[in-house]
Amino acid sequence: LCLNENLSAEITLQPIKRFKFDAAIIFSDILMLPYGMGQEVGFEKGLGPKLGELNLDKLSNINEDEFNNKLKPVYKSISNISNDPILENKDLIGFVGAPWTILVYMINKMSPKRNLSENFFSDRLLIKKLLVIIEKFLKIHIENQIKAGATIIQIFDSWAGLLKDNISEYIYEPTFNLVNHVKKLRVPVICFPRGIGDYKNFCDVVNPDMVNIDYDVDPNKIIKEIKIP
């Protein structure tokens, strides 16, 4: 469905038509990124995402035009949605996965809820190399969504809570780079570092325009800790 420009557009607009929300979020998936980078991506019923083998050499030499062409239906869908009269005076939210969360899926080849290798965190060189490549193509993916008509970008870090060490290197720094990139494009950016714990420090370092918090976090506490623009 994510690669069917007509159906994904219709699914995106359904909540607007029914509930008159003031913004729509595109129907897509954060795993469109590894798919665009050449890694096989599939979904098993009852099990969730399943990715193919990771070929770092192939990823290091990926052609940007090939990436753009593979994800062309996604951008065409966004363009179709943004031009629909129903979205007049409403925002269209595009999104990506944060570099760390994309890396987790690409290396682990499945949701870490199902299985996370004990040695996952041991190959620091692989992690650092892959984060650089992922960040590069996330920036391209973000730019393409904005060019197609997205007026807000959201960054989902679904597995931020997995890290106990190296949070600055693996989460804060690459996410800050994305946030800064979006701001240069003059588009608001929202972050959701699920399970991060220290939202104040995250916001102080990464400096998003908005932040989502976990369902079990007291919003009154967050309001006192974080500077609200």
Named regions from a protein language model:
Residues 1, 55-61, 164, 218:
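Short, solvent-exposed coil/turn linker segments
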Residues 1-43, 83, 87, 172, ...:
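N-terminal basic, low-complexity leaders that serve as flexible interaction/assembly modules and, when applicable
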Residues 46-84:
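A gly/proline- and charged-residue-enriched helix-loop-helix capping module
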Residues 39-56, 191-196:
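Flavin-dependent oxidoreductase catalytic cores
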Residues 1-9, 61-63, 102-104, 111-112:
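An N-terminal domain-start capping segment
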Residues 70-229:
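Active-site loop segments of alpha/beta catalytic cores
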Residues 30-33, 48, 57, 99-101:
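A short acidic, glycine/proline-enriched capping/turn motif at secondary-structure boundaries
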